[in-house]
Amino acid sequence: MEYATKLLLIVSMAAAIALETVVMARSWPELLPLTIGAFVVAAAISLAFDEVCVAVVLLFAYLMPALIVAVHGKLLLYYGTIWSAAFLGAMAPRSVRHAWAFPGRWKAPLVLWAMTIAATWPVVALRELDFTPALLNITHLASSMVGGPPPLAASWIADVAVTLGLGILWFDWLFVAFPHDERRFRQRVVAALVASWAIATAAGVYQLFGDMLFLNRGLFGSLGRASGTMIDANPFGVIAAAWGPALIAAAWLTRSRTLRVLAVCGLVASWLGLWASAARTAFATGCIASAFLVYAVWSTRLQHISRRTRTVLVGVGVIGAVCVTLAVVFLPATSGPLPRLRNTAPALSAPSVAAFFKEMWNRNGYGMVATHLIRAFPLFGVGLGSFHLVVPDYHFLLTHTIIPPDNAQNWYRHQLVENGLVGSIGWMLWVAAFAWFVLTVRPPASSRFSAIVVKGTLVALALVSLVGMPTQNIAVAVTLWTFAFWYWLLARTTGRAVHDPAPARLGRVTWAAIWMLVAVSVSGTAYAARDGLRVPQRAVTAAWPYFYGFSDVEPTLDLGRHSTVWAKRRAVAVLAPTARWVKLTVSLDALNVAKGPIDVKVWCDAALILATRVSTVQPITRYVAVRDGQTRMLVDTWVSGSVRPADYGLNDTREQGLRVEWDFVDAPPAGVGGL
């Protein structure tokens, strides 16, 4: 079961990458061969040199966006499949040869989380296609009132799954490859990511002092915010902030003075990079991580100095902190995060402070909608990767305003609103177990300084995730998992190479519990996908146009007036009635009837109003009342057969399944019953 579940995660991640690639290859045809090639080449090299291959892939972790821009000329989120495919290919050969390698207390939660991701994202992606794969080719539809066609919605869900799933797979791969071998881990993994960070930060510093539009001609360049080589200032700032103290941690694990000098220079560069990004989460990350660095120096390096000297140093530190605070509050600043921080920070009054904390909780309305959705879908959530798809509709329903595009959300609440209580059991148990480990384990003296510094970065990322989503970027997510493993090594190392026996396998009862929870989560997600979270049902709830499956009118169809159209074998329309009743009339073409009796089904608002076998061309009419409180009506039609008149020598290439006519009336005729 251990090998099978890991293989399932790998296959699921490969499928998610494939979906993204196929969809986005329409705008960049070379993306498909590049992604396939990246996976195949990385997997082939990894068969013989897996650690070297992984290091090479990690070297491009923070550089790939700029490289794509340089080669292709523009960057879309999903073009990152090239790097994701290479990363998966580099890990796959060793991963499939080993069982899950997580420490015992973490294995069950992480495997449960991984299986929940692997099994639920396809259901959610199919939901956005209304379980009709043909919608992958439809671009006139929207997934919310603000737009977004079904292919992009499904791709976004796949991208979120890849970010989460590859992170877990990477964490496991590290336990397989470097069990307690911190030095080799540092030489292979940390060195590769540091090299990538150095290039990205150098680009960010150049953007700050030289040309802000260098590799930065998009939104953030126009805002005067550096993005390094990541094209997005927010994750770049977090990466810049995270690695500064980490360089000190790595250098002080060696005896090289050169590396230590370079690490100090890197710490300065990291602050320049995060400052250039003007990212508030990056500034908070840098402050928290640097505070842990100061504490590490104080608690491990200054133990032997006199009490008087320590008192002086404390005084100097307090004065310095006060000066920095006053500078942040009062000194003029036109660059960096300070202007944005000042716009966010509260005034020195109780109402202002209360409003500040309320805004941090609501986060431009995203938190408010998340809280509402948790109440509405508590057990199974809105679906993995779906919060950003449904938030515009529900924000409009709650406030009657359009929510501005943003990524402002509490990460933990974000996972809860997407996965629900059942789907969140895995990640919740893992977060709790790892947090307990980080906060309670005392590292040995030989690595205590570096462990405290790495702990500081982990704590910083955990805290900023209360008000943001930095790890939604796959490079930041991989970095977080890397730091988590690094801290485990530093906290557990004894100064000698130790190879523990293979982690204990999960028992039958544990596996039964895991699969029961996964099955319940998938079932609940599928039920919601056919019920209140079905895309056309969301269109009914939020009153936006939605239709597909009509032969002669797409991509335009007037859903708010009397119309007659030919539906294919399956069609969906969200009507906008102008009266209390909807008159629906359906009929078949003579050519279709000539083939034999045809089964016909029609649903209105999920209620079956017609299910019959038709053998004539006579129309069938039903009168259906609009539900109280609704301004829209969802109509689904299905027929067992269709024809193309062109196949019979006629000049008509349309697929004709069911002729559908709708009209809006105040009431059915006298003597005619309604539904």
Model-predicted segments: where are they?
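Alpha-helical transmembrane segments of multi-pass inner-membrane proteins
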Residues: 2-20, 24-28, 37-45, 85-87, ...
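N-terminal hydrophobic segments of proteins, predominantly signal-anchor/transmembrane helices
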Residues: 45-74, 78-165
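Juxtamembrane membrane-water interface segments that cap and precede transmembrane helices
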Residues: 67, 140-151, 217-229, 361-365, ...
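A membrane-periplasm/extracellular boundary helix in multi-pass inner-membrane enzymes
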Residues: 72, 126, 202-211, 272-277, ...
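Peri-membrane helix termini and adjoining interfacial loops of integral membrane proteins
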Residues: 131-142, 210-222, 341-344, 394-395, ...
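TM-adjacent membrane-interface loops and short helices in multi-pass inner/ER membrane proteins
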Residues: 232, 348-352, 357, 362-405, ...
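A juxtamembrane structural motif centered on a specific transmembrane helix
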Residues: 319-320, 443-449, 483-531
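C-terminal luminal/periplasmic domains and tails of membrane-associated envelope-modifying transferases
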Residues: 527-675
